[in-house]
Swiss-Prot record:
One GO biological process term: L-leucine biosynthetic process
UniProt domain Pyruvate carboxyltransferase: residue ranges: 40-314
Compartment annotation: Cytoplasm
SMART domains hit by this protein: LeuA_dimer
Top-rank lineage group of the source organism: Bacteria
NCBIfam families: leuA_yeast, PRK03739.1
Encoding gene (name): leuA
Residue span of region Regulatory domain: 456-575
Subunit structure comment from the entry: Homodimer.
Catalysed reaction equations from the record: 3-methyl-2-oxobutanoate + acetyl-CoA + H2O = (2S)-2-isopropylmalate + CoA + H(+)
Protein name, as recorded: 2-isopropylmalate synthase
Similarity-based family: Belongs to the alpha-IPM synthase/homocitrate synthase family. LeuA type 2 subfamily.
């Protein structure tokens, strides 16, 4: 097949390929053959990196609500602000400490640049904390060295070392606080690997890590510049070249400029990282930080404990939307409104069959559905595991098929339609969606179903020619039933009789006396609920006046439900 694409008018030539800027070469890489088997250490940076990117930054109420959510979910490293750069951030850190709002197993993290007055102010904000992470950073990339700082490599290293030494100096002013250190060569992805290793090793040496007080070396994709495999190669290279590796925690901080932040984080973790920083639902500058929800739930979907509680995803999303004053998109993985929803007919049919197979397999094993491995097409996880119901899994529009319509009727109204009735009714819904457009809700589907197959509540004219008023079995002779039927026929009340092999055949004969030729072709029934007073649903396929149509009847008496279903089919044929 010929490729008919043509050159675009876009000025792509003004951009330099990444490999021509930074060389990342690791021919003996080992990360591609590794498998993730456990959760990394997590650090939530919603209150700092996420907050700085908001149109309306969080006030104290929203900050506290976000912090409370992160603690409840199980995050143990939480970056809470940049106290030297903002009085609001400083006051928030003090509020957390002075009101004893930080659990003993949670480490707050604060950010600072490598300047003395900023570092001093940072330590002032931490006074009284049990433990804290001081996160020191300075930019190291080729571009920023040239256009922002006007410094060579030695000047950038000196700046970082000055900051590290000042941190150690001011650490002495808060002797009651256990201080851990984190260092970030900001713009790491635009930094030569040899220089990144040089500056990180120099800073780590000043911080003097031990097994009990490891140093975090954070390697941020401040701007995502290449494919995720390149980031992973750089992480494995750094892991090999960092001094005192056993006392160093390699942390990742991916951004999503190229749309591959999650992939970069996962591959970087495979490549030797120990920790990942990000935000809930990927908030952050430009296209956002890596999404901690997606990362955690990806682990969960592989049978790995994320060590974070996502069991009420809608509460998490509502809180994040309130705090950030930004919506979470409908298609955002795991948390969006539509992520567990199928509109496609073939997808709906596969989901319906998958859920039914799960129920059969569980029953055969003598277990509940939750006790057997999840295996449903198009649903990577059970929506109930994150607090969702199955109500929104299948939704109907013009692209939907019989499987989705049938699933909603069964899930919402316990109506288990026979296959040919599913096909027939899906055509009715298709006509409705083609004519009106948009989505049809489960409630609207049932309304259409009722209008089509069940008696209306406003009288017989809208329903059809016949209405069943009552039946009496008159006699049974030689296996043949004679049935007396009270029938409303086109505005008049009539009593007719019919004889046949069973009540259904007798009823068809009674209708014959009114000039209606009806034959039953197929029949199905089931209870709508458990218990002695449960209603039953009957589905009858009939040939009436040269047409083959289904009818539906619902009644506490299964025989009456069957006769109502015949009336339903006849009325539909005669409308």
């Amino acid at each position: 097949m010929q490729n008919t694409q043509t050159p675009s008018p876009m000025p792509f030539g003004k951009y330099t390929p990444f490999q021509d800027q930074i060389r990342v070469e690791l021919p003996d890489r080992t990360w591609p053959t590794r498998t993730i088997t456990k959760a990394p250490r997590w650090c939530a940076v919603d209150l700092r990196d996420g907050n700085q990117a908001l149109i309306d930054p969080m006030n104290s109420e929203r900050k506290l609500r976000m912090f409370t959510l992160l603690v409840q979910m199980g995050y143990k490293d939480i970056e809470v602000g940049f106290p030297s750069a903002s009085q609001t951030d400083f006051d928030f850190v003090r509020t957390l400490i002075e009101n004893d709002l930080i659990p003993d197993d949670v480490r707050i993290q604060v950010l600072t640049q490598a300047r003395e007055h900023l570092i001093e102010r940072t330590y002032e904000s931490l006074r009284g904390a049990k433990q804290a992470i001081v996160h020191l950073y300075n930019s190291t990339s080729v571009l920023q060295r040239r256009v922002v700082f006007g410094m060579d490599e030695d000047g950038i290293v000196d700046l970082a070392l000055q900051g590290a030494r000042l941190c150690r100096k001011f650490e002495e002013t808060i002797p009651g606080t256990t201080v851990y250190y984190e260092y970030s060569p900001e713009s790491y992805t635009g930094t030569e690997l040899e220089f990144a290793a040089r500056i990180c090793n120099a800073v780590v040496a000043v911080f003097e890590p031990t097994p009990e007080r490891q140093v975090i070396v954070n390697l941020p994709a401040t701007v995502e510049m290449a494919t995720p495999n390149v980031y992973a190669d750089s992480i494995e290279w750094m892991s090999r070249h960092l001094d005192q590796r056993e006392n160093v925690i390699i942390s990742l901080h991916p951004h999503n400029d190229r749309g591959t932040g999650v992939a970069a984080a996962e591959l970087g973790y495979l490549a030797g990282a120990d920790r990942i920083e990000g935000c809930l639902f990927g908030n952050g500058e430009r296209t956002g930080n890596v999404d901690l929800v997606t990362l955690g739930m990806n682990l969960f979907s592989q049978g790995i404990d994320p060590q974070i509680d996502f069991s009420d995803i809608d509460h998490i999303r509502r809180t994040v939307e309130h705090c950030n004053q930004l919506p979470v998109g409908e298609r955002v993985p795991y948390g969006g409104d539509l992520v567990f929803t199928a509109f496609s007919g073939s997808h709906q049919d596969a989901i319906k069959k998958g859920l039914e197979a799960m129920e059969r397999d569980a029953a055969a094993a003598g277990k509940t559905v939750d006790e057997i491995p999840w295996a449903v097409p198009y649903l990577p996880i059970d929506p109930r595991d994150v607090g969702r119901s199955y109500e929104a899994v299948i939704r109907v529009n013009s692209q939907s098929g019989k499987g989705g319509v049938a699933y909603l009727l069964k899930a919402e109204h316990q109506l288990d339609l026979p296959r040919r009735l599913q096909i027939e009714f899906s055509r009715v819904i298709q006509e409705r969606t083609d004519a009106q457009g948009g989505e049809v809700s489960a409630a609207q589907i049932f309304d259409v179903f009722s209008d089509e197959y069940l008696p209306s509540g406003s009288g017989t004219p809208e329903w059809g020619r016949f209405a069943l008023r009552g039946t009496r079995s008159v006699s049974v002779v030689d296996g043949a039933d004679t049935l007396e039927v009270d029938l409303h026929d086109d505005g008049a009340e009539n009593t007719v009789r019919g004889t046949g092999n069973g009540p259904i055949a007798a009823f068809c004969a009674a209708l014959g006396s009114r000039g209606v030729d009806v034959r039953v072709l197929d029949y199905a029934e089931h209870a709508l609920s458990a218990g002695g007073d449960a209603q039953a649903a009957a589905y009858v396929e009939c040939a009436v006046a040269g047409r083959v149509l289904w009818g539906v009847g619902i009644d506490h008496n299964i025989t009456t439900a069957s006769l109502k279903a015949i009336v339903s089919a006849v009325n539909r044929a005669l409308r």
